[in-house]
Regions:
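Solvent-exposed strand-loop boundary residues in beta-sheet-rich modules
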Residues: 90-92, 108
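Hot-dog-fold acyl-thioester-processing enzymes
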Residues: 1-49, 106-149
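A structural microfeature
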Residues: 96-98, 114
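Conserved beta-strand and immediately adjacent loop positions that scaffold enzyme active sites
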Residues: 2, 83, 101
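Hydrophobic beta-strand-centered segment that forms part of the acyl-chain substrate-binding groove
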Residues: 29-81, 95
Length: 149
């Protein structure tokens, strides 16, 4: 966690959690799934977020290091539903989670489009490899104020 990511509360600002998750996803989408920047340049299509939610669980402070774990929860020919957990490598605590639904988009038509066959095969392979992982407890969580009584 860099100094310029720290806010007036003395911890990493929420905007940088979003940026950190986005950068981790760029690597996963590019390197693992083949649906990131290279696909956008070569095939004029790429994933766009439809919906996302972040849970802030434990503060990250100046100098903390972190990593992100990625799990595909579901996929179809055009969409990927995934869950990412940010782990504080100093304390071992879950710092945050990020759940999102993304859709492949034809960048010229600006409409949804199926993932190319090679990307779809990688998505399906990762989905199958993670099939026995437990569904994260926070996946699909609603947002709201809990009322007593």
């Amino acid at each position: 966690v860099r100094q310029d990511w720290i806010d007036y509360n003395g911890h990493m600002n929420v905007a940088y959690y979003t940026m950190a998750f986005d950068r981790a996803l760029d690597e996963i989408f590019d390197d693992w799934l083949g649906v990131g920047a290279d696909q956008a340049k070569e095939l004029r299509m790429g994933p766009m977020a439809l919906q996302s939610q972040i849970h802030y669980l434990d503060e990250l402070k100046l100098g903390d290091t972190f990593a992100c774990d990625f799990q595909i929860l579901d996929a179809d020919p055009k969409k990927i539903h995934f869950f990412t957990t940010m782990i504080n490598l100093v304390s071992g605590a879950e710092a945050a989670t990020y759940e999102s639904l993304s859709m492949n988009v034809d960048l010229d038509a600006r409409r949804s489009a199926p993932y190319p066959a090679p990307a779809r095969a990688r998505i399906e392979a990762l989905l199958a490899a993670q099939a026995d992982l437990p569904r994260p407890a926070r996946a699909g969580a609603r947002i709201g104020i809990r009322r007593k009584g």
